[in-house]
């Protein structure tokens, strides 16, 4: 990860959408949320969103990056505003980790992670985007780093099983003191 000198770094929170036209490193942390990265390989511009839910009923309200369809619309508008077409971008999808796997089959619990994954895949298809990579589903959280100067996306996935195992080992070490 050779970082250009003086590169900006932006951390996205849930519901945020960022689009940059200069070398920038974008970061986010995902659980059941999904991140979509947009990168234009010739212009080396792009952005990322961190959406929380597939959609909402919107009546005369401004676009809101918390919702998949609206976050995608924001990214597409940025692409067009920069004289590029959405189809020219390399798109990657990340996240949608089940954070409560014990409740997976509970009929009273809505599976937000699965809904987000389906929404992201459907939006990529509907908008005829070049889906280059995806790391979706499973359990746990992901840390995402997206470098706009070269289009690389770095993912660290921590499945729930690994977190539970780490917690048990820590408890065993602590109990021995």
UniProtKB/Swiss-Prot annotation:
GO biological process: chemotaxis
Pfam families assigned: CheD
Source species, domain of life: Bacteria
Any one Gene Ontology molecular-function term assigned to this protein's record: protein-glutamine glutaminase activity
The protein's Enzyme Commission number: 3.5.1.44
Catalyzed reactions per annotation: L-glutaminyl-[protein] + H2O = L-glutamyl-[protein] + NH4(+)
Protein name in UniProt: Probable chemoreceptor glutamine deamidase CheD
């Amino acid at each position: 990860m050779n970082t250009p000198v003086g590169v900006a770094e932006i951390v996205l929170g849930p519901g945020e959408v960022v689009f940059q036209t200069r070398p920038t490193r974008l970061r986010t942390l995902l659980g059941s949320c999904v991140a979509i990265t947009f990168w234009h390989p010739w212009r080396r511009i792009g952005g990322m969103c961190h959406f929380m839910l597939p959609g909402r009923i919107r009546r005369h309200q401004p676009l809101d990056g918390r919702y998949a369809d609206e976050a995608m619309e924001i990214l597409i508008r940025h692409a067009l505003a920069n004289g590029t077409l959405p189809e020219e971008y390399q798109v990657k999808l990340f996240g949608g980790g089940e954070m409560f796997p014990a409740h997976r089959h509970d009929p009273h619990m809505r599976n937000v992670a699965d809904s987000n994954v389906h929404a992201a895949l459907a939006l990529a298809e509907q908008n005829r985007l070049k889906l280059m990579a995806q790391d979706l589903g499973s359990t746990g959280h992901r840390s995402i780093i997206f470098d706009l100067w070269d289009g690389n996306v770095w993912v660290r996935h921590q499945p729930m099983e690994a977190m539970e195992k780490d917690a048990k080992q820590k408890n065993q070490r602590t109990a021995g003191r």
